């Protein structure tokens, strides 16, 4: 909400620029995440290790929020195809893995959007450009063997996460 308010206040965006996403459907989420991880999130049956890795407290509201974020990234990707540019200001959870959350990231919204658009035939290939100070370890892991997605991460070397699976290009 704060980002939206600042964008409006600075006149970098108007109310008409904002779209309200719907939560991603489970079929889209399951293109990236395991059935077990989705079940744990939906039923609240996470283990202490699951919660420790996520680094955020579990709640039903959290589950609604991450499904909404994934829906926002799908919507932004579709709008970018139509309008040449779009942003999900509530996304970018690049530490989420298929079978667990990590580093404040529960679902990998960007990977879900890419895989959903590929499954729908809207795109064949994708490029992820990750300029966060932290390496996008979830992104690198998810797309490690997928030649249709090129992963680029520019990050601080000696920072979270400790283990950094290689992206296609790391700087």
Segments predicted by a language model, with ranges:
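HDAC/HDAC-like amidohydrolase catalytic core signature
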Residues: 1-171
């Amino acid at each position: 909400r704060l980002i939206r308010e600042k964008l409006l206040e600075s006149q970098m965006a108007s109310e008409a620029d904002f779209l309200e996403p719907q939560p991603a459907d489970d079929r889209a989420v399951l293109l990236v995440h395991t059935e077990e991880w989705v079940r744990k999130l939906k039923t609240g049956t996470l283990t202490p290790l699951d919660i420790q890795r996520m680094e955020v407290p579990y709640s039903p509201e959290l589950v609604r929020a991450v499904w909404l974020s994934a829906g926002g990234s799908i919507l932004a990707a579709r709008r970018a195809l139509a309008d040449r540019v779009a942003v999900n200001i509530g996304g970018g959870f690049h530490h989420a893995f298929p079978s667990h959350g990590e580093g404040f990231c529960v679902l990998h919204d960007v990977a879900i959007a890419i895989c959903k658009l590929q499954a729908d035939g809207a795109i064949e290939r994708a490029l992820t450009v990750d300029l966060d100070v932290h390496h996008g370890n979830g992104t690198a892991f998810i797309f490690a063997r997928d030649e249709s997605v090129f992963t680029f991460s520019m990050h601080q070397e000696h920072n979270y996460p400790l283990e950094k699976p290689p992206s296609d290009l790391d700087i």
